Amino acid sequence: MISKESKMVFSKFNLEGKSALITGASGLLGQQHAHALLELGATVILTDISMERLQLAKDKLSQSFRSELVVIKVMDVTKKDDIVSVSEELADQGLRLDILVNNAAIDPKVDKDEGLKESSRLENFTLDQWNLQINVGLTGAFLCSQVFGSRMASDGRGGVIINIASD
């Protein structure tokens, strides 16, 4: 049984009626972020570059939460046109964005089939790998913050931007 004090604390984290967009949402951390936000009552918009992986993530989350609370959108965070398109789609659907979780990243260290990769060592890291890391992790967060942050600020209610960084 939850104590009265605990209920008071948890009520401060009530996200019912709020929407949160998560980039890189089909990965492990993205799904964990989505699960936590759903537990607090938010609707989550999962974005990533693979519809197949997004659908798998939605199916997994829908085992514990109502599927209508999980929206999926294909979006490449390195392409501003993709981000603007998703922003416009959400507006057309009447979904106000309250929270942005910039979570998209490239993880060169582990491959699900091969395990730890030698190419993840700095001395073996190629310039192309470096540029991809920067484009997804930093430029992607910048572009998403610019587009979605502007949208959150435009109605006067604001919002929250959470940047996840591990590189």
Question: What residues fall within each predicted segment?
Answer:
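Amphipathic alpha-helical dimer-interface segment in Rossmann-like NAD(P)H-dependent oxidoreductases
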Residues: 92, 132-156
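Canonical Rossmann dinucleotide-binding motif of NAD(H)/NADP(H)-dependent dehydrogenases/reductases
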Residues: 10-45
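Residue(s) in the substrate-gating loop at a strand-loop-helix junction
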Residues: 166
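Hydrophobic positions on the long internal alpha-helix
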Residues: 86, 101, 144-148
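Conserved NAD(P)H cofactor-binding loop of Rossmann-fold oxidoreductase domains
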Residues: 103-118
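Conserved glycine-rich Rossmann-like NAD(P)H-binding loop of the short-chain dehydrogenase/reductase
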Residues: 42-56
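Catalytic Tyr-X3-Lys loop
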Residues: 118-142, 162
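The beta1-alpha1 cofactor-binding region of Rossmann-like NAD(H)/NADP(H)-dependent oxidoreductases
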Residues: 51-52, 74-86, 127
